[in-house]
Amino acid sequence: MKRLLLYLLAACLSTACGGRTAVDRLIGRVTEGTGDRIVTRIVRQADTLPDYFSLYDEAGRVVVEGDSPVSVATGVNWYLKYRAGVHIAWDGLTRPLPAPLPPVGEPVRREASGDLRYYLNYCTYSYSMAFWDWPRWEREIDWMALHGINLVLDITGMETVWYNLLLRLGYTREEAGRFIAGPAYLAWWHMNNLEGWGGPNPEAWYDERVALHRRILGRLRELGIEPVFPGYAGMVPRDIAAKIGVAVSDPGKWCGFDRPAYLSPDDEAFGRIADLYYEELEKLYGKANYYSMDPFHEGGDTGGVDLGRAGDAVMAAMKRANPDAVWVIQGWQDNPKRDLVAHLPQHDLLVLDLYADKLPKWGDPDSGRCDPEGFWGHDWIYCMLLNFGGRGGMHGRMERLVDGFYDARESGLGGRLRGVGLTPEAIENNPAMFELLCELPWRAERFDPRAWLSEYLRARYGADDADAAAAWALLYAGPYNEPTQGTGDGAVESLLCARPGLHLQRASTWGNAVPTYPDTLSREAARHMLAAAARLDRAPGFVYDLVNTVRQALADRAYALHRELSEAYDRGDREAFAASSARFVALGYAQDRLLATCPGFRLAEWLDAARALSDDPERRALAEWNARTLLTVWGPRDESGDTVLHDYSLREWSGLLATLYMPRWERYFAELTSRLEGNAPREIDFYAMEEAWTRRTDTPSRSGADPVATARAVFDEVFGE
């Protein structure tokens, strides 16, 4: 009888009954209208049972069954990858299905370990999503569901909540606007790191963001993806004590910026302002079951703050807004602080082990950030951070990522492990790593990443290929299994994008530009990809990977050339310096020419998205300045006359190379040549050069050239083949 009831329920929820569900509409979007040959069935089950999906053939049709819309969407993606040879990734978020539709064959059933699959970092909203419109958001939400995401940080339009809150506290519209950051800097404003920078936003911005967020939220809820709203953590404007007479502490500075003030949890105003915040939030967007709060993020001064009282105040305010809500907090650097959260009730706090792919906090004894106490009995999520600032480069730790997850599951903290999370500072890079992380909870047993990679390549390229496999075997041995110790944060940086200097070891303050593998490795990988192009050049994923592999080979060659020119200058060898520096510059412009053929590596797309926010010239100018500034100087000059964050968000993009990075190097090489000729040194104010670039309004060109032919020509030009 139970089986019969389940069958009837499945039949009612099946597309075979004629109704198009949210998942069916998703399938239609991602398959460009060819998805009506897939039947979906949602079979609800008890919450105590694991999420699942199953694939099977029935009466000549492919059936995807699961316990929720997200589980079914995950199953659809599994079928697309491993049966249909269709890979949905950022370099191609829609693909038509093949005809005839390949059968499932041997039925597939997968169950998830853990009930949560989390997505996004505050920084992602600035480094990747700052200028997205609804069509781009719609495609991303489809990507989320296909990859099993059921819990997502959701901060779009939350500045309007604050705007309305400040008006209720007696601020004028102008004063409220001065507190809120500009479109590219909202992430750090939300995390209590800065106020006002990049703004003020125009009045119309706030209503527009509400409208956009309501569409986002509606789609998330339609697919059963839980939003994580920013909760109230105690942030207030620095001038609030003078404005309304409340007790605050000064958390100090963050990377040269004055942080917002922190409202004392001992002041009765904490509860009152928190309640007003949640009231305004609910007016616009309703309640959430999860709220994200990170007091004292990245070194905020806690002097004079009773951390235990602060944790209680934050939790109590959230529970007044929704008694069933869970506080989500980032496990990052020295947060969460023990005194803030250790005493809080279990299951009311969820800790994101944000950098578990390199420096896990969960208890791995090999980690430099291991906390032997784990998370004090609180629930937690195993996360992959991977990317910093949107800085490009092939990068990952496949073996560490896989083994770390299963080690965590089998550890003493495994009982509190709720699932996995993607927490990159930027997306639209290294698709293999994101795919790998998303599959971890659906694979019951520990597995060899090399075997997984073979399956991934078959799905991504639509066929097996010996040269492509050889290329990726090299990449697996190099950039996709980076060491965990002493290599900086994120991908190995390209010195083409660095502020000029000699003997450089990094391009950004916390980065690393020294390859951890021989530069011949990426060159040989590129050679294999070029050999495979004759067979695979119709696969969009292959074309992106080919361009990226040749890009990596050129970036690695640039490091070797930089070492040569540095040594030549040290020797005073004018001829050798001239030759090496000329090759370095020529390589940079060749890189620009290559990347102009691929949308994922072009500045033009980033600037176009910023300009598209409005037809109003002043608003367009503000958005473009935000877009350009974030990638270059990041912030204003500090007391040193510079900024520690310059080039933190460097991008090896066509348009940036040709209009800023290479002219910057050419200016520097001209100065060094002058010094070698015996002239007095002249200092170059690189900040001034970069700041002038942020005020430009020209559009970098796009190339209509064939990316495969260009990759081959550039490779031959640089490596003399």
Predicted segments — roles?
Residues 2-7:
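Sec-dependent signal peptide recognition
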Residues 9-17:
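Hydrophobic h-region of N-terminal signal peptides that target proteins for export
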Residues 17-114:
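Contiguous, structured surface segment used for ligand recognition
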Residues 35, 87, 91-101, 120-124, ...:
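Catalytic-core regions of glycoside hydrolase
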Residues 114-133, 144:
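Active-site-adjacent substrate/metal-binding segments within catalytic domains
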Residues 512-534, 547-570:
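C-terminal substrate/ligand-recognition segments
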Residues 538-545, 549, 556, 563, ...:
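Surface-exposed, polar/charged faces of alpha-helical domains
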Residues 653-721:
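Extended, compositionally biased alpha-helical segments that mediate assembly or anchoring
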